[in-house]
Amino acid sequence: MKKRFLSAIMLAASFAVALADNPPLMGWSSWNTYGFQINDSVIKAQADAMATLGFKDCGYNHINIDDGFFGGRDGNGKLLIHPVRFPDGLRPVVDYIHSLGLRAGIYSDAGRNTCASYWGEPKDTIGIGTGLYGHDAEDMALFFNELAFDFIKVDYCGADANNNAEALDLDVEQRYKEIAAAIKATGRDDVTWNICRWAFPGTWACEIADSWRTTEDIYLAWESVKSIINQSLYLSAYASPGHYNDMDMLEVGRGLTEEEDKTHFGMWCMMSSPLLIGCDLNDIKGDALELMQNRELIAVDQDPLGLQAYVVKSENGGHVLVKDVEEKYGTKRVVAFYNPTNSALSMSVDFSQLDLVGDVAVRDLFEKADKGVYNGTLSVNVPAHGTRI
């Protein structure tokens, strides 16, 4: 009988994968490690690391500046750049990023104030009044025409009555559609953008944005990673080529256990989430560099179908998820055995649940090794907090 393959794309010595026209974003973002304590040297150092440590060759191509670059507004309302953190402004930083063959990303808020101006200690109070509200057209022209950024993340702290001192309470859908119109008005058709509303915003987001946050902010703890995965298990209907559920920036390489790092990265890839590294690229802990440069897992994330994995079986606290790759309803599947519990699990799936029949060739994507040919059922042992793909 003809073999049907349960695997990711079978990769040759060189990495080649057909990408969707607008695959999930890959790159690095400043917030997880630096918060608002950023400057031009920090950003350039991360760009250098991305270009020289193998990340660019694996498809990572964005350097994103999150909150912390703001310097208030002048008397005419023009947005200013922080004079100490970026003494020469942002355009030289963007030009430097571009000179390395990378794309540059920036941050703003849908309301009047940024998140760092309200949350955390100490607060970055210079972010007060620097949000987009009342300045959509001029700020987008600044970011995309004058400063030549390629991506923007738009937060919502300053537009939610629960998260800003002014109790400004804007209509989420209307507000983000106004922002989408302002981006379009710049004339740039190569700009991508992210809605950051900390929960799935609604199907309207799928029509206007490239990605949208579906959960609260990630933080450096297994409980955070587990919570985000749990909230993402049943959102596959809302992902499509060019439009993705964003599970937030990666905490891989910052101190989770090896199994937790593998689950974190692997499940983000299964879900076709943007892959934005959050650690210092020059100080990656453990085996995380090799993990984040696993081209077989990256191929799963960047697969041209742009689909998100969905649950086919749940048992004893674990979940089995499947994802079509290369061809919808074809002969390849990527399957994740996800164990969020505190004990090891023996997990299995019948090939009939994956719409596969006959002999099935199996490959382990973490090990990057063929595991043989199976028929009927695949069983694996998965450690606590672990995943096998």
Task: Describe the residue ranges of each PLM region.
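Structural recognition of the beta-strand scaffold that forms the well-ordered cores
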Residues: 24-30, 59-66, 103-108, 150-155, ...
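Aromatic-lined carbohydrate-binding/catalytic grooves of carbohydrate-active enzymes
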Residues: 42, 46, 50-165
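Aromatic-lined carbohydrate-recognition surfaces of secreted/lumenal glycan-active proteins
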Residues: 102-120, 183-202
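Glycan-recognition surfaces
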Residues: 138, 189-280
